[in-house]
Amino acid sequence: MDWDWGNRCSRPGRRDLLCVLALLAGCLLPVCRTRVYTNHWAVKIAGGFAEADRIASKYGFINVGQIGALKDYYHFYHSRTIKRSVLSSRGTHSFISMEPKVEWIQQQVVKKRTKRDYDLSHAQSTYFNDPKWPSMWYMHCSDNTHPCQSDMNIEGAWKRGYTGKNIVVTILDDGIERTHPDLMQNYDALASCDVNGNDLDPMPRYDASNENKHGTRCAGEVAATANNSHCTVGIAFNAKIGGVRMLDGDVTDMVEAKSVSYNPQHVHIYSASWGPDDDGKTVDGPAPLTRQAFENGVRMGRRGLGSVFVWASGNGGRSKDHCSCDGYTNSIYTISISSTAESGKKPWYLEECSSTLATTYSSGESYDKKIITTDLRQRCTDNHTGTSASAPMAAGIIALALEANPFLTWRDVQHVIVRTSRAGHLNANDWKTNAAGFKVSHLYGFGLMDAEAMVMEAEKWTTVPQQHVCVESTDRQIKTIRPNSAVRSIYKASGCSDNPNHHVNYLEHVVVRITITHPRRGDLAIYLTSPSGTRSQLLANRLFDHSMEGFKNWEFMTIHCWGERAAGDWVLEVYDTPSQLRNFKTPGKLKEWSLVLYGTSVQPYSPTNEFPKVERFRYSRVEDPTDDYGAEDYAGPCDPECSEVGCDGPGPDHCSDCLHYYYKLKNNTRICVSSCPPGHYHADKKRCRKCAPNCESCFGSHGNQCLSCKYGYFLNEETSSCVTQCPDGSYEDIKKNVCGKCSENCKACIGFHNCTECKGGLSLQGSRCSVTCEDGQFFNGHDCQPCHRFCATCSGAGADGCINCTEGYVMEEGRCVQSCSVSYYLDHSSEGGYKSCKRCDNSCLTCNGPGFKNCSSCPSGYLLDLGTCQMGAICKDGEYIDDQGHCQTCEASCAKCWGPTQEDCISCPVTRVLDDGRCVMNCPSWKFEFKKQCHPCHYTCQGCQGSGPSNCTSCRADKHGQERFLYHGECLENCPVGHYPAKGHACLPCPDNCELCYNPHVCSRCMSGYVIIPPNHTCQKLECRQGEFQDSEYEECMPCEEGCLGCTEDDPGACTSCATGYYMFERHCYKACPEKTFGVKWECRACGTNCGSCDQHECYWCEEGFFLSGGSCVQDCGPGFHGDQELGECKPCHRACENCTGSGYNQCSSCQEGLQLWHGTCLWSTWPQVEGKDWNEAVPTEKPSLVRSLLQDRRKWKVQIKRDATSQNQPCHSSCKTCNGSLCASCPTGMYLWLQACVPSCPQGTWPSVTSGSCEKCSEDCVSCSGADLCQQCLSQPDNTLLLHEGRCYHSCPEGFYAKDGVCEHCSSPCKTCEGNATSCNSCEGDFVLDHGVCWKTCPEKHVAVEGVCKHCPERCQDCIHEKTCKECMPDFFLYNDMCHRSCPKSFYPDMRQCVPCHKNCLECNGPKEDDCKVCADTSKALHNGLCLDECPEGTYKEEENDECRDCPESCLICSSAWTCLACREGFTVVHDVCTAPKECAAVEYWDEGSHRCQPCHKKCSRCSGPSEDQCYTCPRETFLLNTTCVKECPEGYHTDKDSQQCVLCHSSCRTCEGPHSMQCLSCRPGWFQLGKECLLQCRDGYYGESTSGRCEKCDKSCKSCRGPRPTDCQSCDTFFFLLRSKGQCHRACPEHYYADQHAQTCERCHPTCDKCSGKEAWSCLSCVWSYHLLKGICIPECIVGEYREGKGENFNCKKCHESCMECKGPGSKNCTGCSAGLLLDMDDNRCLHCCNASHSRRSQDCCDCQSSTDECILPAREAEFYEHTKTALLVTSGAMLLLLLGAAAVVWRKSRSRPVAKGRYEKLAEPTVSYSSYRSSYLDEDQVIEYRDRDYDEDDEDDIVYMGQDGTVYRKFKYGLLDETEDDELEYDDESYSYQ
């Protein structure tokens, strides 16, 4: 029975239990894999073998011995522990980990390791006794008898004499058969052991299946003996071969470490053909011991040259495994070898990854030939396969290379392999050449190994430079990996260029450490792109990997960047492709990643290492798919950017294919370039595409594919999008333009550690979030713990951690005690009741109080006398009794003492104080003076004035390591609200009204009722404007409901007043009154009862069940009327009815007097019962007044009717010409029909129409009129005033008119608009500007014209260019951020009424240079002569209070303070920390050591250190000290300091000066420009360097920066202005055909078809040029391609464009809107021109500089004006020199001979051109919605425009690509057209 599992498990609506269980088992299988613990331990013990034995014995272990070559690592065995257990061991022996000498211990876990051969189940082993040499095909690829086209050239190496002699190779496997005839001759016992059996014999364990044949097979490939007529030949048949048996048992970390480190000084090469399971779901690698063994091996193996480890890459191809999940092949220390089949095709078992270094042969399909080698039981096999066969083959080739050069290091070997391996005929679809020129593949690494090339390279090899390791840690920011999407992270690496010991310039290995959490690891794919563009696949999707463990610091490695440069942008991409087995869409997270770059700082290859690669294989040419790109008509050289395919011309736009990348121009021409420019990314197939508008760099064109952002945007790295506001939990990092993550405990922040709001359970302490403990508790780093019972408050555990003591305890020397100790007394004098024990006077043994007069007992030898301790009568003061009873003199510093040393004082002279038995000048900083004695401060204080915790004067970290800060005499752990922790450990106040800050100038959070005001970040009172209310919770002004001028926080919708244009109703404001209300004087009033809509006069309609009657609502309409249910009105009954149910004559319910009711009809009682002729007409309803007048007229007519009742027909009324019953239908001449009656004159609101003969209504807004558009008086209402203008009524007068008495009158010139009277202007004509209602030619002083209105400059501003942008401040004020301030902020200094930034090292400064600092930005730096230094220079010391370097005393050479000399100047010696001369000499003398007497100074010196004139300290009057010499006048470069009588060096920028600072220059050095008294290499913004005068001259005030004084010399513009680059001008609003780029602050050209636009794309048009009309933002041509419109209206003709234009808007060559291929459009005069580097352009006067731009044409001629300007200085200087040399006559002669300078303009063409005015299309619907789509922002997207010709044919602009190019996102066609049938 066949089970259709696929259908069964995927069929919708069905859930089979067996299917579900099977899927669950598959998903949980990796999770349920059990660890097996052994009874073996690995232990690291310091102290040697004996110490290890002692510890092992103590805890019941047996010390088996050292683990391999790992020093201090030992193998312990415990016989009483279960041999194999799923639980780790417990018991007393586990206490070994607590031994001090035990540094590390690990119980060994069994690892699963798989041999990397493949056993074909159907193949029967065939054994041969004959020699196999002829059948070893992989040795004979060069003899043309085998399909393998590429040879490993092993015979070539043999012919050069290399066979592996003296090289030792060890096979790490299941043992080797050392007795095999092909192995026994080369067997090396020193390279062999049995780790599984713990002996030295590697012989395999034999069984019936011959399972342990693997190691013997691998060994035969390497070193099978040649010419012994037994079986086969090894690649290195004279090499020594050993084996380590380690796979035939439990494989643990210790087993592996022993194996890979076995006898490393003897073994050269270790070969391993095993690894973790190749099941497609395992992620495993070497554990700590094995990793250590690898590192030790490469560092110390082979006597420091490094062991060589060769590893098989893996056989998990069928399981879709990826060898990057194998930590052995993924290591930089191993050489990972893959396999290729004889045909060069990929074997089915092969895994691919970026760590594979090279390839050797193995088998492919089952029918392919396999590898011949030795086998168990002294036999041979021709069935060896898999990567297991490839690794030993590589080990053999490496052995040949090591024989050729035994001094190759382990890295040399890898370099040699990289340089000599080659692609050959190996078939892979991902071969690529990296930036260093190496061809590499994920399947085969650098290709097939070449033995001959390797030995040739090794012979002349020079050891590569030392390996450098650079760890580049990226920002740790978690990114969400969403299903079916990618996460990209970019990191700009420097290669550790700032650290010479770690600098990596040229790469070898690149390791990426990644931590990822994910619900299904197998769905992930990871890529890394190097700065050179080489893309490595670090991980591919793995179908069988269901693990939810993700990756934890897993190291992926790539060798694909070998030889490339390290510095630049590295891009990591993580893709999540959910599999069908994944039933949930939980996103993963990229938690962190880092780069480890391995390589060298210098080029690794010396000239002797240069070796040309030679392809040694039979080459059969494969047809190049690009051969179609011939260049039949062109035979010249191609542009360097063209590929080898060729070109059809010399320029980069003539390439048939590009070498690197290409642009597409507007006209679809492709230009080849070397790299994509900023704002673009490298798309597939060498194409440069544009990033999304907000991206600075990107990896795709969508808005969520940004890598960095433009200014003003921040990169949200989770979404890879650029946002203007970062999401919650992150902050705006302005320096990096990214959204940085707040620290873990922050809810909101302004920096990683600068929290402004904390998560639940935490409180803000300063700028960090931490736990706040209650009184009586302290925080130990994890939680709150109770203080010691003696403490009321504390900062740590124990009685010595108290801050205050509990009741009944007092503080003594930092501890809380119940009573004072001996020699202490209880002090009650402290403020606030604080009690403490203070030390007694030193003369007392015990005391009752302070001082020497409160003693209660005395020391031995002293007598108590009235509270004082007196010396006995034997000795005097200043003496003590020695042991012999004699009086001896105290040490000189003591007044009284009890011993001879300076520590035995008991009282001191008046100039000193007593401190612990010493008499000192001052108490140390941690003590305070009281009663001439030093007492310790409270332990929280650094300095103090008393013993309490509130008597501190300075703070530091306390004894518990807690940082403390001074606040009101207390040292606190955290500063209170409104203060910040400053340097010096003090809490300093924040700016006024600030609650949280980090310096005294910038506030982060204001107090309640205040808000932060940028840009200074100060707090101002929260004063809400009209229409806002103060939100107390968020402390900001929130808007009231729409229309409110005032409201309250309790109910923002309850308005106190309304804005203009809004109506008030029940405390709410409405744009229009709500239902059932009407507006009167901007108030809504309720309609009458039951009225649904009304005005102040009447109701318009009523609620259901009521009827409108006479302007009010009634339920019963009354007699003569009936309720019309449909209209909701009371309608009159027929005139015959008294009551009725409808208006018809037959709907009466009762009749008028004299009439009778008959079937609903009222009839005369005398009439026959037939319908009357006139009774079938209802009376029309009109306004009540009109109805009333008509009824009166009808009453008279009724009487007439009664009189003529006998007549059958009645005549019309006399006023009617014709009638319809009693109503007129038309009127005679002179009468007009109105309400079915004829009137002689029309009523108000109507006018007599001669044409219709009736009274026509005036327009609704007109009270009286004389014609349809001839209003005479407009309707006037209080809330709706209308004005009469030219016979029509308007709400406001048109431009140029003002309202007077309800009529629009003309404004007087030059008013454009006015109000109130003709001269009260609101705006002005032409160039006039408005100021206070008057139009002037220019604005008054301190004003600026903004949109034609004079605006006052900002406060304190002298001159401005915008109402918010000041250019020059009034005296005593300084310009900062476009505003004027009384003083400059921190990090700025005032200069020429401007705030100029300090150097980055300075917090405060008086100039821009690094030596102009007044306060350092880095608090750890020391300030010396304006410089911020790490340490103070010799002769100075650091003053801790202000971090300044102060000069040592004059005699001091080195000092630590002003009073502590450490070394003295010549002639002085240190005595008691002071430099003193042996003898005091006179001021004009010095001490001569030779004669031991004072000698006179030189006559030029005032004070000196020796006899010569260059040994002066000071100088006589009117001379000045220059270094150590006295001079009469200071030389140039120095200024004279008359106060100190010294020559002080000028600043390095000054030539002459008046002081040492950069702001005190009088003249500048050559090449510098003077600005005020400052010399600059480059003038600051607002100035330019004038080379003739050497000064910085002012730019025109319209420029922010410039190259000259004119308004056309601007290079950048101030805020609110935009630079028009082509003119060099700054514009407030961009001119016609340009739009304002708000980010770049430039005016950019619209698309050629746009007249006005919002962007440069073709779809951003707002209006169009002639011959185009607007449709959804695109200007569509009205003629077919190549033609333009001629004529207006619907009947127009289409004429052909000029031959140079592809599209145009008019005739001639200067009306082009699109160009043909190879031409670029000059936007300024709409011409199509060639590139200047094109051959045919050399004949043309004008051409485009395509090097500058490929998007539009830039004429080289436009540079002329700039160059002309820069040459001005040279011309002026030359003229001055000629004046001096030749005189006036020569100048006249020169002028007469001079020729006019050519101006940088264009020559007017003779061909006439017609200009066509632009117009706005009327086709744009008012309700048109332009939908935004997230799309590719590419420069050629707008080219795909479809338009229709006059004949109905639809045309399209087409895009052309290379013929071999296919793109999923874009179709490319030939010309096509469609016709509508």
UniProtKB/Swiss-Prot annotation:
Residues 1825-1844 are annotated as: AC 1. PC5A is expressed in most tissues but is most abundant in the intestine and adrenals. PC5B is expressed in the intestine, adrenals and lung but not in the brain. Residues 463-603 form the P/Homo B domain. The keyword Signal applies. FU repeats lie at residues 632-682, 685-732, 736-779, 781-826, 834-881, 884-929, 931-981, 984-1030, 1034-1079, 1081-1123, 1127-1168, 1206-1248, 1252-1299, 1301-1345, 1347-1390, 1392-1438, 1442-1487, 1491-1536, 1540-1585, 1589-1636, 1640-1685, 1691-1738. Residues 1856-1877 are annotated as: AC 2. One of its GO terms (cellular component) is Golgi apparatus. Glycans are attached at N227, N383, N667, N754, N804, N854, N951, N1016, N1220, N1317, N1523, N1711, N1733. Serine endoprotease that processes various proproteins by cleavage at paired basic amino acids, recognizing the RXXX[KR]R consensus motif. Likely functions in the constitutive and regulated secretory pathways. Plays an essential role in pregnancy establishment by proteolytic activation of a number of important factors such as BMP2, CALD1 and alpha-integrins. May be responsible for the maturation of gastrointestinal peptides. May be involved in the cellular proliferation of adrenal cortex via the activation of growth factors. PANTHER family: PROPROTEIN CONVERTASE SUBTILISIN/KEXIN-RELATED, PROPROTEIN CONVERTASE SUBTILISIN_KEXIN TYPE 5. This is Proprotein convertase subtilisin/kexin type 5. The gene is Pcsk5.
